[in-house]
Amino acid sequence: MHVPLHLAALGLLLVAGAAAAEPEIRPLRIEVGFEGSCPHSPQGVKQEGPAVFRLFPSWRASPGISEESVGRSTRLGFKVINEGRAAEPIEVLIDWQYDEAPPKDRPNFSSRAEYMSYRDFVVVRGPLDASWRTTMLDIEGSVGRLRIQVPAGATEIHWHPPYTFTDCERFVDRVARDPRVRVEVIGQSEEGRPIRMLKITDHSGRPKKAALIRARVHAYESAGSYAVEGMVRWLVSDDAYALAAVHEYAFHVIPMANPDGVFNGLGRLTAPRGADLTFVGSRPDRLHDVMKQTADRLRPALFVDLHNWQSKQIDGLLGLNVDVRERFTRFMPDQVQFGKQWFIRDPYPTVARPPNEETLGAYCRRCYGTVAVGFEFPWFGRTVDDVRATGRTTLWALLRAMETPPAVGKSR
């Protein structure tokens, strides 16, 4: 059958018009639910357009307390999956829900603006990237707006560079090959994950002072994990000061104190209504017993707790004896290369009877005369390698500060 040319052309135009009228489908989706992700499930993600998504970092399967409650989250981690072949633009609205926090759990900040000033950036790593890159956000109320191009494949986005429970297990397995390292399982979490402790010392028969170092008490504080990696790598190196350190001390390192919180993408606690392991026995949790029993067994001469708080410009030097602290800051002054200066809080007076709420460091100081210190190393302006190097420098400087200073005029 012969179709007139003008009718055939009209048919092509109609087909083309129908195709043009079909909505554009972009091959983008948000993936959560992996180890350490936050939100924890797709219920914390809302799609608002073909390439526009809203995320709720405070979403929990069950109501939480402290930094696990609505408007208090300190964790963020998700993936953007581009199933196409070309890079695609995406807009992600990260809704921290500051104004929805219950009054008893309202963030301890002067204003929403201060709270969001710590949440105006994320770190991004594409499928071909070797390292994390910082990306700044536009802030509107308590929402951070991220606009980026994502290549084909999976692009991972977090508030801070992540460090998972699996990462820690692999690190422990690697360093355990060193003859100076022995690994001990000191307990299990409520969900059955092992709490592993490294003992690092040389094989001389001399008596050793015990040093206890721990990281990841608070689940979101991944800088503690990278700092402890830097410390451990230094202790098993051939550096002269490291060799002297393991000759004098037996270092006991707990690199992952809160594995359930880290694995499940929490902020501060061991569970949505769980324990804060900073303190001795804040709530019923078997990890409280593990930490206290370990401290009682070791009676450490030195205790180090590694954290990273949210402040961008301030490193924390907390609870160190004044004489040791003064020497420490000579060996490790303000880290101006990262735009940081020390906030110093001297130890609280030791009391004979325990207070209602006592940190593990204060407990060790009160019971065993331990030199105890907490460090806070915020991420902003630092890379993963920077934090590892900061950990190494911190331990070196602290051990130098612990030494008896030479008498004036006695040097040779």
Mark where each language-model region is:
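Bacterial N-terminal signal peptides
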Residues: H6-A16
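Bacterial Sec-dependent signal peptides at the C-terminal "C-region" and cleavage site
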Residues: L14-E24
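Active-site/substrate-binding loop(s) of hydrolase catalytic cores
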Residues: R182-T201, G205-R345, R365, T370-W379
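N-terminal secretory signal peptides that target proteins for export/translocation
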Residues: M1-V3
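Extreme N-terminal flexible tails
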Residues: E22-P151
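Glycine/proline-rich low-complexity spacer/linker segments in large multi-domain proteins
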Residues: R106-A113, F165-E184, R233
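Active-site-adjacent mobile loop/cap segments within catalytic or ligand-binding domains
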Residues: P162, L317-L318, R353-R412
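Extended acidic/polar, glycine-enriched regions
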Residues: I139-P179
